[in-house]
UniProtKB/Swiss-Prot annotation:
<feature type="compositionally biased region" description="Polar residues">
    <location>
        <begin position="245"/>
        <end position="256"/>
    </location>
</feature>
<comment type="similarity">
    <text>Belongs to the CWC26 family.</text>
</comment>
<feature type="compositionally biased region" description="Basic and acidic residues">
    <location>
        <begin position="374"/>
        <end position="434"/>
    </location>
</feature>
<feature type="coiled-coil region">
    <location>
        <begin position="373"/>
        <end position="431"/>
    </location>
</feature>
<keyword id="KW-0747">Spliceosome</keyword>
<protein>
    <recommendedName>
        <fullName>BUD13 homolog</fullName>
    </recommendedName>
</protein>
<comment type="function">
    <text>Involved in pre-mRNA splicing as component of the activated spliceosome.</text>
</comment>
<feature type="compositionally biased region" description="Basic residues">
    <location>
        <begin position="274"/>
        <end position="287"/>
    </location>
</feature>
<keyword id="KW-0175">Coiled coil</keyword>
<dbReference type="GO" id="GO:0071005">
    <property type="term" value="C:U2-type precatalytic spliceosome"/>
</dbReference>
<dbReference type="Pfam" id="PF09736">
    <property type="entry name" value="Bud13"/>
</dbReference>
<dbReference type="GO" id="GO:0005684">
    <property type="term" value="C:U2-type spliceosomal complex"/>
</dbReference>
<dbReference type="GO" id="GO:0000398">
    <property type="term" value="P:mRNA splicing, via spliceosome"/>
</dbReference>
<dbReference type="InterPro" id="IPR018609">
    <property type="entry name" value="Bud13"/>
</dbReference>
<feature type="compositionally biased region" description="Basic and acidic residues">
    <location>
        <begin position="496"/>
        <end position="505"/>
    </location>
</feature>
<feature type="compositionally biased region" description="Low complexity">
    <location>
        <begin position="436"/>
        <end position="449"/>
    </location>
</feature>
<feature type="region of interest" description="Disordered">
    <location>
        <begin position="474"/>
        <end position="517"/>
    </location>
</feature>
Length: 559
């Protein structure tokens, strides 16, 4: 299983580094419609007179000038545009048309999207012959001669060489700083044309590296020779069709342009990395200078893209997707131009950090095909997290639950239970007292006395005899109707009650009735101070009773 996993990883690496021969052709065909439309427009520009289409390029040029970050991206192309301006001061409209229609350096200066469109044109083999015509028309015309007069032949030839062959433009972009002294010469020769865009590019800090790069005379003569030899060079355009050279060129071109941009824009973070990139392709560049000419010859003879793809896979497997992305850029000029630097910086470190957009699963493990080292690292991290959380689990098991009220204060449940118990006891006592009062205190006492008497009688033998004292006393105390001794008995009880000091009772005329038969106090003066409710109550009861009696008598009248 491990061997199969390694084979899959190798297969994925091959697939990502270099797509198969059929896929890049299809991608080129997809990208051709956007680039082909522009190529068709350029062909129409060649056919139509320069004066008729002059107005449209002026607007585009103004838009390019207004888009400052896009202008800052391609420094080499801007100085070339300055050369075109110097050469054709009399007619600025024709210069703008030449910048866009032809693959001249002015088009490179205008927008990075235009540079990418060139790459697309080089990628499309059908558009190569018209490009030759375009290169022949502006390159052979006075522009080159005037550039020779203005001592700026090297950048011009480099650009001309960059238009048919993408490998030389890489050198040109790596050699982009040698164009800085010609800029100074141009500013010295024609200071009027420099201010619009070149104020940013005229930053003196960037000039010394350009001098150093411009001081290297080795790159300029080979370019002239190569440009002189392959003027009619459809195979070179086919080289641009080759995916390995085109992505390399595209990647080197945005890198150098970004270096210049960042130098002029004073971006210290990304500039050193871009310079290192420019140096690294620069080291590759001598190999290109030595090896590119025989390779070009072989490609001219063979005209077959597959070996180029192989070289692309061998040399720059990571740069190929960047080149494709740059080819897709021309649709959005300013936006893609401004977004290109971060994209390139990401592609610089694909192996160290991996793709930043890789997804992770819910468990935190990286998704997709992962190496054994990455899995081992992830497992170790998970184990560390589990160990760090173990002591928390132990503490949480034995800790008491903390309850809080709405205000956030801790609740003492034990104290709350005690308080609630006390409240319940007090409530039960109060309820019992009210229940006792409701039943009646006298009735309660009588009931208690009866219970005591019953218990006492239970202790006596079953049969009662006449000489039983308790029975004899109970019978003597009873009052009987018609008993001559009854009055004597009452008086005797009254005397005994006085001795007991009982409360005095009311002894006046009969008081008014009430629902509960409550007797008035002994101090009542006989005045009724009620609201008359009791009288009305008894009147209603008497009326009701009378009606019932009358109805009963009426019902039994015939009987």
């Amino acid at each position: 299983m491990a061997a199969q996993g390694v084979s899959k990883a190798q297969y994925l690496q091959r697939y990502l580094s270099g797509p198969p021969a059929a896929q890049p052709r299809r991608r080129r065909k997809k990208k051709l419609p956007s680039g082909s439309g522009r190529a068709g427009m350029r062909i129409v520009d060649d056919d139509v007179g320069w004066s008729s289409i002059a107005a449209v390029p002026e607007k585009e040029e103004e838009e390019d000038e207004g888009d400052m970050p896009v202008v800052a991206e391609f420094i080499d192309e801007r100085p070339d545009e300055v050369k075109l301006m110097e050469e054709f001061r009399t007619n600025s409209k024709w210069k703008l048309l030449g910048d866009r229609d032809e693959d001249s350096p002015s088009s490179d200066v205008s927008v990075p999207a235009k540079a990418t469109t060139r790459q697309q044109r080089h990628d499309s083999p059908d558009n190569s012959p018209p490009r030759r015509v375009r290169h022949d028309s502006p390159d052979l015309s006075p522009p080159r001669q005037e550039r020779n007069n203005s001592a700026s032949l090297l950048p011009r030839k480099e650009r001309q060489h960059g238009s048919p062959d993408l490998s030389p433009p890489r050198r040109k972009r790596h050699d982009s700083p040698d164009l800085s002294p010609p800029r100074r010469k141009r500013h010295d020769d024609s200071p009027d044309l420099s201010p619009p865009r070149r104020k940013r590019h005229d930053s003196p800090d960037l000039s010394p590296p350009r001098r150093k790069r411009h001081d290297s005379p080795d790159l300029s003569p080979p370019r002239r020779q190569r440009h002189d030899s392959p003027d009619p060079s459809p195979p070179r355009k086919k080289r641009h069709d080759s995916p390995d050279l085109s992505p390399q060129e595209q990647q080197t071109t945005p890198d150098l342009s970004l270096q210049r941009k960042k130098r002029y824009d004073s971006d210290p973070d990304s500039s050193p990395s871009l310079r290192k990139r420019a140096r690294s392709p620069g080291h590759k560049k001598p190999s290109r200078t030595k090896d590119a000419s025989p390779v070009k010859k072989l490609r001219r003879d063979s005209d077959s893209p597959p070996p180029r793809r192989g070289t692309q896979n061998a040399s720059e497997a990571d740069l190929s997707p960047q080149g494709k992305n740059h080819r897709a850029l021309p649709s959005g000029k300013g936006q893609h131009g401004s977004k290109s630097p971060p994209d390139l910086s990401r592609h610089h470190y694909p192996d160290d950090k991996g793709s930043p957009k890789k997804g992770n699963m819910m468990s935190g493990v990286r998704a997709g095909l992962v190496s054994a080292d990455v899995l081992r690292r992830e497992q170790q991290e998970l184990r560390k997290q589990e160990r760090s959380s173990k002591h928390l689990e132990e503490e949480s098991r034995h800790t008491e639950t903390i309850f809080r009220d709405k205000s956030g204060r801790k609740r003492d449940l034990v104290q709350e239970r005690l308080e609630q118990q006390q409240k319940d006891e007090a409530k039960s006592e109060r309820d019992e007292q009210y229940a006792r009062w409701g039943r009646g205190l006298a009735q309660g006492r009588q009931q208690q006395q009866n219970v005591e008497d019953a218990i006492k009688e239970m202790q006596k033998p079953l049969a009662r005899y006449i000489d039983d004292e308790d029975l004899d006393r109970m019978l003597r105390e009873q009052e009987r109707e018609g008993d001559p001794m009854a009055e004597f008995i009452r008086k005797r009880k009254a005397k005994e009650s006085k001795e007991k000091k009982e409360k005095p009772r009311y002894s006046g005329p009969a008081p008014p009735l009430n629902r509960f038969n409550i007797w008035p106090g002994h101090r009542w003066d006989g005045v009724d101070r009620s609201n008359g409710f009791e009288q009305q109550f008894f009147a209603r009861m008497a009326n009701k009773k009378a009606v019932q009696e009358l109805a009963y008598k009426w019902s039994i009248e015939d009987m």
